[in-house]
């Protein structure tokens, strides 16, 4: 699967390394692409090396990052949702998956025009793991992986389909919930 991650911080770096390690084509959109190495190493809480993933590209070009992606993960803070949606809209297409992690209330409004255009919009109730950058663009800590992922989507009826498509990215169980609001208002977010 061709996966783009918007945001090269703690979570985006961990997700990029994980998906690349699991054999997917990964692009990270970052404001500082020059700081990233080709491979990102993942470490556990006791400094033990877990794995590394080879990132296909790190870019600050929206078209290059979004246009060919099957799945786009948005890992930026909620206050950046409206601007992010505007910037990626020209390069999204019907059927493309847009995932918010962690899912947040009001994201559905920020991305409403993309949903209206036919993107498959969803959010995770929690993150893959607590993540902390060890060395920016080069390594990251995975501190407490989640036992499973909860997915809520708009429209709600596609949550099971999305779970089936994204579960191989993470290698952990994915469970659909009734609707996006269940994800958006989970107390852990």
Tell what function each PLM region has.
Residues 78-136:
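Rossmann-like NAD(P)(H) cofactor-binding subdomain of soluble oxidoreductases
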Residues 49-99:
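Rossmann-like NAD(P)-binding element
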Residues 136, 141-189:
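Internal alpha-helical scaffold of NAD(P)-dependent oxidoreductase catalytic cores
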Residues 23, 69, 94-95, 118, ...:
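A general structural motif
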Residues 32, 62, 102, 125, ...:
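Residues at the C-termini of beta-strands that transition into short coil/loop
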Residues 1-50, 66:
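NAD(P)+-binding Rossmann beta1-loop-alpha1 motif at the extreme N-terminus of oxidoreductases
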């Amino acid at each position: 699967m061709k996966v783009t991650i918007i945001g090269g911080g703690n979570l985006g770096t961990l997700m990029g390394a994980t998906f690349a390690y699991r054999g997917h084509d990964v692009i990270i959109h970052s404001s500082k692409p020059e700081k990233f190495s080709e491979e990102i190493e993942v470490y556990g809480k006791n400094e033990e090396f877990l794995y590394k993933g080879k990132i296909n590209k790190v870019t600050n070009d929206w078209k290059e990052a979004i246009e060919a992606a099957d799945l786009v993960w948005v890992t930026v803070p909620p206050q950046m949702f409206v601007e992010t949606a505007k910037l990626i809209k020209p390069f999204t297409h019907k059927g493309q998956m847009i995932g918010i992690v962690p899912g947040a209330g009001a994201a559905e409004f920020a991305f409403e025009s993309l949903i209206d255009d036919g993107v498959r919009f969803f959010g995770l109730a929690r993150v893959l793991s607590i993540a902390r950058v060890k060395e920016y663009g080069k390594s990251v800590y995975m501190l407490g992986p989640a036992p499973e992922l909860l997915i809520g989507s708009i429209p709600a009826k596609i949550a099971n389909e999305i779970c089936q498509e994204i579960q191989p990215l993470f290698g952990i169980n994915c469970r659909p919930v009734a609707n996006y609001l269940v994800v958006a208002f989970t107390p852990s977010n």
